[in-house]
Amino acid sequence: MLRLRPLAVAVLGLSAFPVSSLVHAETLLGAQTVTAKGYAADTLETPQAVEILQAPAAGGTVAGALLRGKPGLAAQSDGAWGQNPVLRGLKKESVVVMVDGVRMNSAQPQGAIASFLDLGLLERAEVVKGPGSVLYGSGAMGGVVNLITPDVGFSAEEAVGGRVGARFSSVDRGVAGAALLTRSSAHGALMLGVAGRDVDDYRSPDGREDRTGYQSDTLLAKYKHKLSEDLTLRVNLQRHEDEDVWYPGSARTGAGIPKPLGTATIHSPEQRRELYELGVDAKLGEGTLSAELYRQEVFRQIRAFSSAKQRDYVRNDVRFVTDGAKAKYLFPLGADHLLTVGADLWRMRGDPERYIDNNPPAFDNNLRNDPFDKGEIESAGVFVQDEFSLGDTRIVAGTRFDRVTGDAERKGMTQTTGLENADNNLSWSLGAIQPLSERLSAYANLGRAYRAADMRERFEDSARGDGYFHVGNPQLDPEVSTSLELGLKRGGVGLRYQLAAFYTRIDDYIAGRVTGAVHPQNGLPFKLTENLDKVTIYGIEGSASMPVGAFVADAGFTWLRGENHQDDEPLFQMPAPELTLGLGQAAERGFWWRAQLRAVAEQDRIATRFSNGTENPTAGFVTADAEFGWRFGKLGAFESAGLAVQLSNLADKRYHEHQTEGVSGNELAAPGRGVALSLNGSF
C-alpha cells in the first residue's frame, strides 16, 4: 500500500496554508459561491446564509474543525480525526457533505466522512445553511458542506506553477506537508497534488490523550482538455487514506459489553476514499450543459478493541460504493433571468463483513455476524431552478422530485422478506432578496427538504453503545423538514455583517423508541427504529466586521434551541450559545496578526429520556487564540511566500464541546495550549 510519509512531503512543503483567517476563515461577504445556486454567485445576492471558510494561516487538522466557532456551525467529535460538521443543530445523515460537488455516501457509526480529505489540498469549504434538497436531494435538511479542491484553468501560453509549504504543531507533535503542481496551455490543463499528515496523541491540560494520533495521505489529479471553444472534458481523481484512527469517544463498559472484555473502544486500522469522475462542459445554444459520471468508494475497517483481552473482539470490513451520474443545463431566458434544469442519479451499495468473538470466557470463536447483507439505496431525481428579478427584488425558486429505493438481501441474521421500500419526495424552495440600500439587503427563504433513511436505520439489527439493542426498519418514511429563514446582509467597505433568524420543523423524525421488551439472548432493552413525532429547531446567528483605525474588529454569535415533541424535552446534543470576538491587522505584505476570544455558554438543556441518560450538562468556557505571520513578496524561486504562527488555547483551559462523544462526565478533553508553525510559497 502507498504511504506518503508526511515528513518527506513537508520537506517539499505544504500547499500554501491559506492566508490569515482575518481575511478568509471568517465569512466572506461579497465572495463567490458555487454551491448555493449550483453556479457561481455572489453571496450578497444569495437568499440564504452562506459561509466561505478556508484553513487558518498556520493550517489545521481536519475539515470539520473549520466550522467550530462560526455562526450556526459546530462540530461533533468522537476523537481527533472524527469531527462531524453540525449545521444549525443537524449532523451526519441530515447534512450533505461533498467533495468538489460529489456527495460522500457512507454509513457513519463513528468518525466523520468530512475528514476524508487533507486540508493541505483544500481550496475552500462552502457551507450553505438551511434546506438544500432542491439541488442536492436526500439529507440536505441542515444544509450542505462542499469541500472544494483547487481548480485548474487554461492559459494562452504554456505555463507551469504550483505551491508548497510545511506545518509543524506542538500540541500533537504533528508534521504535515503537501504540494501542488500545475501545467497549463491553451488546450490542456493538469494539476497534481499530494498531502501527508502524521500526528501523535495530542496534549490536553490533563496530559497526553491516548489514541488521538493518526496518519493520513491524499493524492489528487485533475485534468481538463479543450476539444473546441464550446466543449471541454474534465477528469478528477482522488485518493485519501488514513491509518490507526481511534475514536476515544466510543469507549464503553457494560451496555451489552461482557464484563470480561473490560472497556470496548472502536477504531479503524485502515480506511480510504477513492473518487473517479469524468465530466463535460458544453455550450449548447444560449446555455451551458455540465454533466458528470462518477464512482466514489469509501472503505472502512471498524474494530472493537477489548481492554481486558488487549485485542479486537469485533472485526468489521465494509465498502460503500456509490455510482452516479448528474447533469444540469443552465440557460438565460432574458437579460436578468437564469433557468437551471437537471437530473441526478446515484446508487450506493454496502455489504459489511463482520466477525465477532462472543464465546465467554475465551472470546475467540470468530463467528460471522453480518449486520445486513448486500444493502442498496438508489436515488433518482429531477429538478428545476429559476432565478429572476421583479423590480429590485431578486427571486430564486426551485422544485425537485426524487424517488429513493432501498433493499437488501438480508436484515439482521434472519429476515429476508419485506426489505424493499420506495418513497417519492417533493422538495421546493422560494427565496427573495431585496436591496434596502446600496450596501444593505434583506432576504427571506422558505423551503422543504427531506432525508431518506440510511442503511443502518433500515437494515441493521445490533447492540450499540447507548445500552440498547437497535432494530432496523426497512419501511421507514423519509424525514421531511420545512424551514423559514429571514436575514440581513451588508457588504462593501466599513461595517459588514450578516444576520439570520431561522425556524425548522422536521416531521416523521427517525429515532429509536423504547418498547420495554428485552432481547432474549443478551438481555438488552430493545429500541425500535421508527418515525416519531416532530422536532423543531429555531435560532438566530450572525457575524460582523469593521475597521477600527488601523485594525479590523470582528464578531460572530450563535443561539439556537431544539425541541423533541415526542418526548417533550430538548433535542439531543444541541450546540450551546456562543460568542466570538476578534481583533487584528491585515497586510498584503509584511506583518499581520489576529487575536480571538471564544465564549461558549453552559449547555444544561439536555435530552434525558431520548438519550437514556447518556447526555449530561456541559460547563461553559472561554478560550483565547492568536495567529500572526509575515507575507513576503517574490522570494528566490517563489513568486510569493509566507510564514505563519498559530497559538491555540493560550490559557491552557480544560474544556470539551457539548457535542463531544463519551461517557457522561468523562468526555475527551479538548487540546491544550499549542503552537503551530507553517511555511508556504507559490511559484
Please identify what each model-predicted range represents.
Residues 241-243, 249-257, 299, 349-362, ...:
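Surface-exposed extracellular loop regions of Gram-negative outer-membrane beta-barrel proteins
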Residues 144, 149-183, 212:
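Short strand-turn segments of transmembrane beta-barrel domains in outer membranes
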Residues 257-284, 318-320, 371-379, 420-435, ...:
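Outer-membrane beta-barrel signature, preferentially recognizing the C-terminal barrel domain
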Residues 75, 103-131:
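Short acidic/polar hinge/loop motifs at secondary-structure boundaries
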Residues 162-163, 179-271:
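Periplasmic-side early beta-strands and strand-to-turn transitions of outer-membrane beta-barrels
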